Amino acid sequence: MGVVRFGVSIPEELLEKFDRIIEEKGYVNRSEAIRDLIRDFIVRHEWEVGDAEVAGTITMLYNHDEADVVKELLDLQHDYLDEIVSSIHVHMDEHNCLEVVIVKGKAKRIKEIADRLLSLKGVKHGKLVMTGTGRELV
C-alpha cells in the first residue's frame, strides 16, 4: 500500500481550528487526523448506500418491569438471527437493564432492526452506532 501526498487549500481560520482540535485529541500530525476523517466519511457513505455490508451496535436502556418489554426484545432479536452476532446484558439496578446488541449485515436491514428495537414501549433510551466491517478501509 503506497502513500500519496496531496495538497488541500482551506481558509486559514478553519485550519487553525482544525489544528487546535487535533492537538486536543492527541494526533501527532494532520495527516493521521485527515486519514481518520476520510475513513469516517467512507463508513458513513457505506451506511447511506443501504446495500453495503456494515457492522454496528444497538444499545438500549430499559426497565425490565415494563410489561412485555423483555419478551418483545427477545422475540425481535430472534427475528434477525442472521444479522445479530451477539448481545450483552447488564443489570444497572433492580429495575433498569442495559443491553448491547452487536449486528452485522446490509445497512438498510441493520437500520430496520435498530428502529424496531428502539421504538419498543419500555425502551427508555437507545442508540445505533454504525461502523464498517473493516474491509472497505485501509
Curated annotation (Swiss-Prot):
Name the source's superkingdom: Archaea
Cofactor detail note: Binds 1 nickel ion per subunit.
Q: Which cofactor does it need?
A: Ni(2+)
- Which NCBIfam families does the record associate with it? PRK00630.1 (NF001884), PRK01002.1 (NF002169), PRK02967.1 (NF002815), PRK04460.1 (NF003381)
Question: Which keywords describe this protein according to UniProt?
Answer: DNA-binding, Metal-binding, Nickel, Transcription, Transcription regulation
* GO terms under biological process: response to nickel cation
Q: Which Pfam family is one of those matched by this entry?
A: RHH_1
Q: Name one GO molecular function term.
A: DNA-binding transcription factor activity
Q: Does the keyword Transcription regulation apply?
A: yes
Q: What is this protein called?
A: Putative nickel-responsive regulator
InterPro entries documented for this protein: Acetolactate_synth/TF_NikR_C, ACT-like_dom_sf, Arc_rbn_hlx_hlx, CopG, CopG/NikR_regulator, Ni_resp_reg_NikR, Ribbon_hlx_hlx, TF_NikR_Ni-bd_C
Q: Which residues bind Ni(2+)?
A: H78, H89, H91, C97
Transcription regulation recorded as keyword: yes
User: Its function?
Assistant: Transcriptional regulator.
What family is this? Belongs to the transcriptional regulatory CopG/NikR family.
